[in-house]
Amino acid sequence: MKFLNQITNYAKEAVQSAKYIGQGLSVTFDHMRRRPITVQYPYEKLIPSERFRGRIHFEFDKCIACEVCVRVCPINLPVVDWVFNKELKKKELKHYSIDFGVCIFCANCVEYCPTNCLSVTEEYELATYDRHELNYDSVAMGRIPYKVTQDPMVTPIREFAYLPAGVMSGHDLPAGAQRAGERPEAIANTAKSSEN
């Protein structure tokens, strides 16, 4: 009797483990049917979603130096330097900066700014070799932001991680459109043939 119980328990455990292995393999096979998600980075870029929070854009003329952005920031990051103008009886902004090496891109400063002098952009390329270059002042933050779809040297790609196979066309581009200019391989071949 004890022997039959052991065989029964062994069979139940074998069936249960086969069920768990089948569940795991079903996820694996689901991912195998998807297309590869490789982006040839400087020549192809993913288009950020509408709610993407990238580099913060700052408009110096709109700022009233109220320091609301500093108060709502979880890490008190924005540096606002101002002087009180006695003639006009109001604050004058002298300097504004944010260190994007420390910023967590929560966009609280943008949300609570009363004059809308701060806005988030689609820019996500903030890589530098020196961390001090990530400390953007009002001039660097005032640069006009660019969109990936407007860069002629880049093929914009929609985020396609969860799209069905075959649906990978870029935003704002006609079907079959290529990026402007030649690919680096073609330029290198042209240079080699002109040297010969």
Swiss-Prot record:
Domain of life: Bacteria
Regions crossing the membrane: none
Record-listed [4Fe-4S] cluster 1 binding positions: C63, C66, C69, C113
Cofactor or coenzyme needed: [4Fe-4S] cluster
Subcellular localization, as worded in the UniProt entry: Cellular thylakoid membrane
Membrane topology of this protein: Peripheral membrane protein
Reactions catalysed, as given in the entry: a plastoquinone + NADH + (n+1) H(+)(in) = a plastoquinol + NAD(+) + n H(+)(out); a plastoquinone + NADPH + (n+1) H(+)(in) = a plastoquinol + NADP(+) + n H(+)(out)
Leading EC class: translocase
HAMAP family: NDH1_NuoI (MF_01351)
Quaternary context: NDH-1 is composed of at least 11 different subunits.
Protein name per UniProt: NAD(P)H-quinone oxidoreductase subunit I
Native organism: Thermosynechococcus vestitus (strain NIES-2133 / IAM M-273 / BP-1)
Gene assigned in the entry: ndhI
